[in-house]
């Protein structure tokens, strides 16, 4: 959706989403995901997010459509995202 420049000059490819989302087509492409989490924004590499929500890869949606998203991630997921929340 957009490119962001890190303070060190690195360009980040960012997909802006309305909810936490993983997508098979983003794997290995150095894409970052940006989405709201309980009143804050999260910016995280997609492949790191994929590791955090690895159980989602066992869902029918992931297997058939190649994507999965959740409007309200559970407490464990939110805790795992803490290092990626921005203010």
Language-model features: where?
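Mixed-charge (Asp/Glu-Lys/Arg
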Residues: 3-87
């Amino acid at each position: 959706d957009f490119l962001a420049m890190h303070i060190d000059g690195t360009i980040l490819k960012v997909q802006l989403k309305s909810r936490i989302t993983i997508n098979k087509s983003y794997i290995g492409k150095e894409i970052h995901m940006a989405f709201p989490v309980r009143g804050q924004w999260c910016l995280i590499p997609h492949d790191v997010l994929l590791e955090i929500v690895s159980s989602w890869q066992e869902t029918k949606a992931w297997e058939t459509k190649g994507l999965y998203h959740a409007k309200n991630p559970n407490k464990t997921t939110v805790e795992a995202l803490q290092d990626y929340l921005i203010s």
